[in-house]
Amino acid sequence: MGLTKNFAFLVFCCQRYCSMDGEAFEISLLDGEEDRFGGTVVNLMEVESMTIGDFDSKLDVSLKAWKDQGKKGIWIKLPSELSSLVDTAIKKGFTYHHAENEYVMLTFWLPEPPSTLPCNASHRIGIGAFVLNKNGEMLVVQENSGYFKDKNVWKVPTGTIKEGESIWAGAVREVKEETDIDAEFVEVLSFMESHQAVWQRKTDIFFVCELEARTFEIQKQDSEIHAAKWMPVEEYVNQPYHNKEGNEMFKLIANICLKRSREKYTGFVLTTNSAKKSLYCSVDHANLLKETADQASTSLSD
C-alpha cells in the first residue's frame, strides 16, 4: 500500500520522456498545493529565476497531470520578476484573475465550463463622515480634485477604506487626514451601492458614518482639500446640489444626517471588535446583545 502511494507521488511529481536520440529525461511538475475546493495553487513567489522554455515544458506536463488527477481550478501566482512567463501561461489557456504590486494571479478551469472560480474583488468600500461638534454643526469640505472640484459643493469628508482596515477606523482616519480633527466613531447611519462605479465594472459600497468631534480647530489637508469649515446641518442639506435631478441619493443621505442631528434616526453601532472582525447592529439590539452575550443562543430567540 505504501509503495503504491510513493509510486503515484513520483508519477505526479515528474514525467519521463525520450529525446530524439533515445535518451530518457524527466520533466518535473510545477510545485503546487491542493486547495479546499479540489484545485491546485502554484506559488512561484520564492522562485528566483525560471526560463520561458523551462516554464513551458513544466506547465505542459503539470496540466496533463492535474487533469489526470481530476483537479479543477488551477492558480498560478507569478512575481513581477517572472512577468516574462505570463504570455506562456495565457497561450495555454490561463486568464488574468487579479494583480497586486508584487504579483499577478492567473487561473485555469480544467473541467468543462462553466467555471466556479470566484471573481476577484467585486466591491470597493468607501466612507463618508458625518461629524458633529458641540454646537450641533457638521464638518464639511470642498475638494481640490475629483468629481466635486469647482462645483462649489460642500460635502462630508470621504475616502476609501484601506486593505485590512475597519469601516469605523477608516472614517476616523479620513477625518483626521483631511481636516486634522480628532473624532470618535458613533455609528453607521446608512450605506449606498453604486454599480459599475469603479473602472466601469466594480461596485462601490459607500458607508455614511456618524462621528463625534473631540477637537474643533480645523487644519485642512492642502493636497486634497480646497476648504473646510463647520456648517449648520440645515444649510448643508439645503444646498442646491441636493435638489438637482439625478442627485436623489445625495439628498436622502443629507436628510438622514439632518434627522440624526435631531435625534430622530438611529443606525448601526459597533458592538464587538477584534483584530480581524467587527460586528455592527441596530442600536435597539446592541444593549440586548451585550446583556445576553453569555446566554445560550436559544435564549435570544425572543
Swiss-Prot record:
The keyword Metal-binding applies. Residues 122-254 form the Nudix hydrolase domain. Expressed in roots, stems and leaves. GO terms for molecular function: hydrolase activity; metal ion binding. A motif (Nudix box) lies at residues 159-180. Keywords: Hydrolase, Magnesium, Manganese, Metal-binding. GO terms for cellular component: cytosol. Its cofactor is Mg(2+); Mn(2+). Its EC number is 3.6.1.-. Mg(2+) binds at residues 174, 178. SUPFAM superfamilies: Nudix (SSF55811). InterPro entries: NUDIX_hydrolase-like_dom_sf, Nudix_hydrolase6-like, NUDIX_hydrolase_CS, NUDIX_hydrolase_dom, Pre-Nudix. Belongs to the Nudix hydrolase family. Probably mediates the hydrolysis of some nucleoside diphosphate derivatives. This is Nudix hydrolase 5. It comes from Arabidopsis thaliana (Mouse-ear cress). The lineage of its organism: Eukaryota, Viridiplantae, Streptophyta, Embryophyta, Tracheophyta. The gene is NUDT5.
